[in-house]
Regions:
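Non-catalytic alpha-helical scaffold/packing segments enriched in small hydrophobic residues
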Residues: 14-21, 53-57
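Flexible, active-site-adjacent loop/turn segments at secondary-structure boundaries
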Residues: 12, 30-34, 99-100, 117-119
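Flexible internal linker/loop segments at domain or repeat junctions
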Residues: 16-42
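Single conserved hydrophobic/aromatic residue that forms the stacking wall/gate
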Residues: 1-12
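CBM-like carbohydrate-recognition segments
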Residues: 43-56, 61-62, 67-138
Length: 138
């Protein structure tokens, strides 16, 4: 068996615990606030880059984690995150947003760096998540 999960049961189990914690702490639309421990106010920034990374990870983890219920919940959140990221709120119009795909990412708010901006890695993980999702449908 050359499966990536061979001998990694404990690793995937721990990753499942982390994923479950994230599911409990995400807002209804799946786009996290810039910090899970930040006070939530109307002006609290959302982080599209974190959502894109999570969506990609939820899809990948769903391929290896045992249990149908966990797989379904990870995929459901990934789908929700991808749909929200593809909405007008987060998806930039072509030729805008410095030609980046996603809007509203946060790099380092405490340093006042990369706040509510497009980020290269947000686009990368968004595209990776879309590709992983497409490949699941095959």
């Amino acid at each position: 068996d050359r499966s990536p999960s061979r001998g990694l049961g404990d690793v995937y189990k721990r990753q499942g615990h982390i994923a479950d914690m994230l599911l409990r702490r995400l807002p209804a639309d799946g786009i996290p606030y810039w910090d899970f421990d930040a006070p939530i106010e109307e002006q609290t920034y959302r982080d599209a880059s974190a959502a894109a990374i999570m969506a990609s990870a939820f899809i990948e983890l769903s391929r290896y984690i045992p249990g149908t219920e966990a797989k379904e919940s990870y995929l459901a959140m990934a789908e929700k995150q991808l749909r929200t990221l593809a909405s007008k709120e987060y998806l930039a119009e072509p030729g805008t947003n410095e030609c980046f795909i996603l809007k509203h990412s946060v790099g380092a708010l405490p340093d006042k760096s990369e706040v509510d901006v497009p980020l290269t890695y947000a686009d990368y993980y968004f595209l990776e998540a879309l590709l992983r999702y497409k490949n699941l449908q095959k």
